[in-house]
Amino acid sequence: MRGVSSWVSSAPILVLGGLAAGAAAVEEQKRADCPTFWTTTIFMPTTVYVTAPEALMSSNIVSRPSSVIGSPTGSSSRSVVSSTSSSASQRITLTTSLTAVGPSTADSASGSVTASLTVTLSTFTSAVEEPTSTQVPIKDPITSSVTSGIFPSSVTSGAPGIPTIRRPSPPPIFSGYKNAIYFTNWGTSGNSSYQPQELPVSELTHILYAFADIDANGTVKSSDAFADVGKRYARDDPHNRTRGHNAYGVVKQLYLHKKRNRNLKTLLSIGGFDYSPKFVPVAADEARRRVFATSAVKLMADYGFDGIDLDWEYPADAEQGQHFVLLLKACREALDRFSFQHRIPYRFLITVASPAGPVNSHKLDLAGMDTYVDIWNLMAYDYTGSWDNTTGHQSNLYRSPRHPSATKLSTDNAVRYYEGLGIPPNKILLGVPTYGRSFESTSGLGQAYAGVGAEGGGVLLYKTLPRPGARELWDEDAKAPWSYDNTTRELVSYDTPRSTLFKARYVRRKRLGGAFFWEARGDRAGAASLVNTMSKSLGWLDQSPNHLWYPMSQYDNIRRGMPGP
């Protein structure tokens, strides 16, 4: 139930955005015959977010003449653009001048919210501890004027109902392409081990650390505590002489990367193929969804990450697809509550590893999920493998009329399907594999084969390809390469800098959000690097800042911002 105490009155007004010294003037006007008003006038370009109580939004939004008290210092023109309401939220959008007025009585003060620009007000949908409202930015290229009045005490419980301008979802402003990569905890040991210091962070915008595990009660937990926070790297304290409870391992290295690269974000990836069955009972139960969301946010904050990634492979039917929506909703609410409670003006991210093939994507309520998802990591690979009867391309951009049985799926078809359901293209990252899939005893593309080989179940790292003796070939229609050895009769489908270049062009042409790679261990260094090729081809990488302040982390060195070695 949304009560009258469902909004905050601890601060009369909070303006987000950089304000130069002397750019704001606050004037308290006290009169014996009228209410008290606080006025903030900003004489510079700014973005302002306004949230008002539901009681006000439901019945007390009016357009007032500019002559009334509390009118804006800017333009006095006004016109209602649209008005919508629902059980979840109520919004009213107006242009140039808006006055929101509380009822005036002899013994209670009235007030107003006035903006000389386009504004959307939306209500909270729960108590203060669980804010879930969506705010839309107010923009004025010259000046913005917001007058926040003191509303009647009846609006809140025991305190004046002062509207608070809160941190919202980020505005849809393009800040550069995203170039993300998955980094695995198991990849730090064994053959072909790959350490976090080897990550090409200057070419990346996001690192997704895989994978966290899930308990039966929904608790998200580390799947390898030693790799996460226990392993000592160079310059780490080998004898634990540093005071306090500190994080080492991959977590420390990723935090250091963030400090040195302030546009680099890190995310906790949860699930993956092995842990995906654990999503099923958790997502189906409300209590366990809450546990999942709360514990995921805690682990994210403990590790000093910028968000969470959900990799559920895959919901088996439409019912599980709806459960996925509810799980994402719980996560979004938990992240927003976390930001709100800790006064953090930052939007922590939710990303989803999503399927490209129709067998799995058609079971998802993509439009419902999109409400809570910031980035879609479209897994545009594994189009073929040991489960198929014939060989084929595993990550082709287009279908090939000359090789139809080798291109049963395509990335272009997947992107068009997502777009057709209303998913914004700039939220989609195109997945690129840093591995290949092999087929043995075959005569070529679209042909039968006898096996995939014992080595890695037919999965070969890109940096080992092509195999000695194999010849690299190119499918112009599909924009996809493959290699074939006439002697061993082995075919391997994988990506190269050439195919990655075509994918980068596709990202730009379709105005997608960028690309991501699975996974870091498989790429080459230098000019043959797929990550480097994508980065250089996209050109302008995402410049949005990361977050470094985690005073709630259980690890002392992360709480302190990782001082010293």
Residue ranges and their predicted role:
Residues 22-169, 539-540:
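Fungal extracellular serine/threonine-rich, low-complexity, intrinsically disordered "mucin-like" regions
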Residues 170-173, 250-267, 271, 325-344, ...:
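Surface-exposed amphipathic alpha-helices with a cationic face
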Residues 167-175, 217-238, 250, 254, ...:
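Glycan-binding loop/region signatures in secreted carbohydrate-active enzymes
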Residues 166-300, 532, 539-551, 561-565:
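Glycan-recognition patch characteristic of GH18 chitinases/ENGases
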Residues 187-202, 284-302, 358-369, 411, ...:
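Short, acidic/polar
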Residues 207, 268, 310, 331, ...:
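Conserved, mostly hydrophobic/aromatic
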Residues 180, 219-242, 313-465:
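Substrate-binding surface in catalytic domains of secreted glycosidases
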Residues 1-32:
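Fungal secretory targeting signals
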